[in-house]
């Protein structure tokens, strides 16, 4: 295990030598919008051609089109990008923000805490060198994407996300790639295709948010809403006992490479302010925070000493740095705290427990609730979106869907309507630990109480028995709630409940949650979601191994697993794998049946067993002997169509196959007759 110093040195080396992190056989490309500076980043996965006939000397191939996929990595996946984390990313949206003429550049920062940090020369070695001047709305102006949408304005950001969400699916014309079963959307109204006007309508109605602080122009526009692709958030951040600025920047880059749509900086240790500046200046995705964490650091961790003034200054500090969305635990009310007394695991939300302790200590109402109007006014001046935190979320499935959880949800519904009065974009955070049978009730209640504001859930975790594997236990619930209508999933890593995640944990959590999000998109019937599935399935059936790896979410791992058993280069074109071997590969057998049908000029679906001539290449006596042997084995096994794999008939050797059903009994024969019968059975 690496020491802390070694880990920091490795992270430093990573960012010093940072080059674009490309997936194999992929290429970054840009779709052009309606203006020269509107170029929407995507990734194309190139495929090899399919051999469909001809001869060894003159083979005939069928071309397979490149598959376009969503790309969160910004410049980090562009081989032509000049990356320097000390300089930060290109300010993609600066011109769009400036030309609206509703913001002003400030001569100095507004936060008293930020002014103190800038005056401290002892922090110079940690500071991001090229600090931009912050912007704020002009007096009396509102600069949120919701505000523009409600006034009928389609911004460049809205056009950007419309192009991005469609993923160029109009270019996919192959019927085999476009096929899909009807989805069940549970009332979601999916745009087909997604247009800038559709995006505007969803933002205006509050059913979606476009989280983009005017002080984070480096971020590429993305949208969160149940009528769009399900998004995934990754959490990073240092703590009082581990991690450094270098490691957090490394984790940010790594997270976007593996598909994080947004990143939350949950730092609680030293240098929170400086760490966040480095993260924002180098982030192509929206950044979220929980401001109460930093406010607590400012009062030395004593919750009772928190004040509205300290918290307000923290909001201004973070808004002027460029934080795109705040998690605010304004729904933890004094009267709800006693409801948690009977819980198995009490209050498990850090923000929720901080505010509960403050309420009890002062016996006053939550100051975040009391000052919510001022919070909204502040957010409207920077276009910071609100993520209303679920401080009463259950920390075990025993506490799921209890009185405290749903009481807070009702209050969040009240607060989202108030935020909309200020044109502040808002999402609702959700649980937590919920068994499968209670998940849909959470989604249904949220839609009802919060007027379809986007739902953002941590999992939910469906069982509590698997520390070290909570990316699995929660991934199950995440897939379900994504299908029911959740707009964004907060990933869970293998280290959940155990420790701070490292790079590999971040990757594992993201892969698990990208699977869950995609499964939800397919189940909802999102147009175009299944194209990648179909392309990979076609590659699998045609034994295009490299295409199978490259079309997957994690090509490196897929290739490594295949290489463990079949490392030879020849295995990359073989028509079998180590799972079944060359004799029992179902897809190979199916292909042989299709080839037979083609030779007979017959529709493969119309083949009858009697049509297959199995006597042409095997002696008749051998065939009859094999058939007699299999007949005897079937009778000795009790003449049962299906029976247990561990059952062994007298006088008959046990087989290595997992099942001795009629199908596997036929397969056990090495005669050509049994192979032909199995081919017909597969059809």
UniProtKB/Swiss-Prot annotation:
Cofactor names: [4Fe-4S] cluster
Pfam families tied to this protein: ThiC-associated, ThiC_Rad_SAM
Residues that hold Zn(2+) according to the record: 433, 497
Cofactor note (record): Binds 1 [4Fe-4S] cluster per subunit. The cluster is coordinated with 3 cysteines and an exchangeable S-adenosyl-L-methionine.
Alphabetical list of InterPro entries matching this protein: ThiC, ThiC-associated_dom, ThiC/Bza_core_dom, ThiC/BzaA/B
Catalytic activity, reaction form: 5-amino-1-(5-phospho-beta-D-ribosyl)imidazole + S-adenosyl-L-methionine = 4-amino-2-methyl-5-(phosphooxymethyl)pyrimidine + CO + 5'-deoxyadenosine + formate + L-methionine + 3 H(+)
Biased composition (Low complexity): 653-675
Residue sites binding substrate per the record: 235, 264, 293, 329, 349-351, 390-393, 429, 456
One annotated Gene Ontology cellular component of this protein: cytosol
Leader sequence residues: none
Region (Disordered), start-end ranges: 647-683
Gene3D superfamilies, A to Z: 6.10.250.620, Radical SAM ThiC family, central domain
Keyword check for Lyase: yes
Root EC class: lyase
Entry GO MF terms: 4 iron, 4 sulfur cluster binding; carbon-carbon lyase activity; zinc ion binding
Family matches, as PANTHER family: PHOSPHOMETHYLPYRIMIDINE SYNTHASE, CHLOROPLASTIC, THIAMINE BIOSYNTHESIS PROTEIN THIC
Oligomer status and interactors: Homodimer.
Family affiliation: Belongs to the ThiC family.
Function: Catalyzes the synthesis of the hydroxymethylpyrimidine phosphate (HMP-P) moiety of thiamine from aminoimidazole ribotide (AIR) in a radical S-adenosyl-L-methionine (SAM)-dependent reaction.
Protein name: Phosphomethylpyrimidine synthase
Lineage: Bacteria, Pseudomonadati, Pseudomonadota, Gammaproteobacteria, Alteromonadales
